[in-house]
Structure formats: structure tokens, C-alpha cells
Swiss-Prot record:
Glycans are attached at residue 29. The keyword Lipid biosynthesis does not apply. Residues 1-24 form the signal peptide. This is Sperm-associated antigen 11A. The keyword Cell membrane does not apply. The gene is SPAG11A. It comes from the Eukaryota.
Amino acid sequence: MRQRLLPSVTSLLLVALLFPGSSQARHVNHSATEALGELRERAPGQGTNGFQLLRHAVKRDLLPPRTPPYQVHISHQEARGPSFKICVGFLGPRWARGCSTGN
């Protein structure tokens, strides 16, 4: 009887050593899953795993809200572009924004 029981016990121990996490799989850390659930509720669609959700939540809390870019009102003359003229000077004709009287 003892010889017949020995191989089954050794095989059971071998299986237990090969798969050590299977006995702990029933115990789930519920606090971690609750934290991820809260992050998913706070930031829907921000990623597929918990790290991306946490990173986006931290970035949103640390950075100030963005302001729209500064807008400058441009006059119609500036919108058409600068008015260049051909000025003839000592070095010959050239493009310039405005001709001075000294050329």
C-alpha cells in the first residue's frame, strides 16, 4: 500500500512545485481592482490598461488647464502681405519694402 501511494504523492508534489501560483489564484487583491475601477470611471477611454489610466489621471491633476492660443487681429494691409517695391540704388535694382530718398 505504501509503495503504491508513494508515486502519487510525489507526482502531486511535483505538480504543486511546477504550478505554485495556482493555489493563490483564488485570492484576488480587491483593493487594486477597485482603484482601477475608479480610474476607469474618472477617465473613460483613456487607455486599455491600468498604467495608462493612472498616468493620464496624474497628468490631468498635475498640469494646469490649457488656455487657447493668443490671437492677433491683422489688418487688411498686413493680411495681403508686405508691399515690396523695386528700388534703384547704388548697387542696382533691388526689392525693398520701401525706398528711401537717399538711394
